[in-house]
A protein has these predicted regions:
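Terminal targeting signals and extreme-terminal segments of soluble enzymes
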Residues: 1-170
Length: 170
């Protein structure tokens, strides 16, 4: 897991070099950085780790995150809280955009919409937030996602507009 890898500038990239996951986006393009996260070569982002999301698919402009729903995530009516679903979708939507960005550029959410089609419960099983980039410009990008179960049932859909920033180390 700490096997050195080479970044685009020829420098070694290991977990020890990057105590915080955000640091990798300063040196690597988004697709390479997300691929390293998927393979466990660099740490997950704090929210992904805390929410126990798994990064299932990483391709240019396409990312899939998964989550196994459980009762600890329920709201008062007995389904997974909408904020949890929205967080999973936001993670996928933003990562899809990040996957098309060069090193030193980051994207953050400006606008986020989630439409809930049916409740998610523990009985639903693993759900997948499948996100794709619709447009990536110089300053903004848009992405769309579907939250689906393994059987293909759609539980939510969403879209996001993100601002693209030049990341400058503090």
């Amino acid at each position: 897991m700490t096997t050195p890898r080479s970044d685009s500038a020829g420098g070694a990239v290991t977990i020890k070099n990057y105590p915080h996951a955000m640091d990798i986006f300063r040196r690597l393009d988004g697709l390479e950085a997300l691929g390293m996260m998927q393979r466990g070569e660099v740490p997950k982002t704090p929210i992904t780790r805390w929410m126990n999301f798994s990064l299932e698919t990483v391709e240019r402009g396409h990312v899939v995150f998964a989550m196994l729903p459980h009762e600890d995530l329920y709201n008062m009516i007995g389904s997974v809280h909408g904020g949890i679903i929205t967080t999973l979708m936001d993670n996928a939507l933003g990562s899809a955009v990040q996957s098309v960005l060069p090193a030193g550029r980051v994207a953050t959410t400006m606008d986020l919409h989630t439409r809930f089609h049916r409740p998610v419960t523990a009985a639903t099983g693993k759900v997948f937030a499948d996100a794709r980039v619709v447009h990536a410009g110089r300053r903004t990008a848009t992405s769309e996602a579907h939250l689906v179960a393994a059987n293909g049932t759609v539980y939510a859909t969403g879209s996001s507009t993100l601002i693209i920033l030049e990341d400058k180390p503090a």
